[in-house]
Amino acid sequence: MQEYITLDVRLIHFFQKYWLGMARFGLFVIFFWFGILKVFGLSPAAPLVQKLFEATISFMSFDTFIILFGIFECVIGILFLIKGLERIVLPMLLLHMITTFMPLFMLPEVTWSGFLVPSLEGQYIIKNLVVIACAMGIASQLHPMHRHQHSN
């Protein structure tokens, strides 16, 4: 029994030591990889993005949008790697997540197979709850900003 307790303690310490770096790296991989696929026109998500684009945006071409959106995702990924830039990347992630979840409501014929039965595209979107949870974990490690009082 003592061996299990020792293993348990070691695993917990390992996870406590490395979770934050792994969370940052995982978010980088997801956002940079998926973003760069969009930039080079290789993203399997492009048809879904295009359907949402056609339902919402009309001020630029889709070809331009998908490249810019891919670059935006790459930047999010890179920023998650850099400690100290969390307050910049978290609002960017919020904007991205809002747009990512929109097809669940705006394109139900694509994202749902039936009531509470997501299609493959719907599952792809819903799994972003894990991305949000991971980002919340990173955000929970921030220290509150303090107002500096200046005397005249």
State the predicted function of each range.
Residues M1-N152:
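Membrane-interface extramembranous regions
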